[in-house]
């Protein structure tokens, strides 16, 4: 240090009159533009159990719509969970090589399906979603067991969510068709896709 440079002055504790308060700021995460539609969907789904308990499965897996988004909508919007009936939402597995097919979804009273079909890892890694969502949306194959209710929920990014009511039991051959389709894609994971009937 040269003789012309000054050392910084440090105040003693007695010289500090008072500490400045910590700066105040608030941070609110961005709010979804479709939050009202998500709330309406959650309320509608729970209303399906008004007369008797019902079950549903969400057949979608993207950052726009998935089962966690449906489950947490009211809480994230700061809306208290209302008293009264609540439709039980069954877990639906969505990752091909990690998860087995969620056969319990085929026993649910309702399927909640997004159009276009929603993925977070790409269609090539989420055939579990496609194998059920596509025929339900198209009304073909196993999709003939479901009737689309007269309600839709438009979400962000051009996604629309529909609710389908199961109108009949799923036939053993429909279970087996799902098993065969998934096993053909991943023969080494056949045990994960084995039909229970």
Where are these regions (language model features)?
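Transmembrane alpha-helical segments
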Residues: 1-33
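C-terminal luminal/periplasmic domains and tails of membrane-associated envelope-modifying transferases
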Residues: 20-58, 63, 67-197
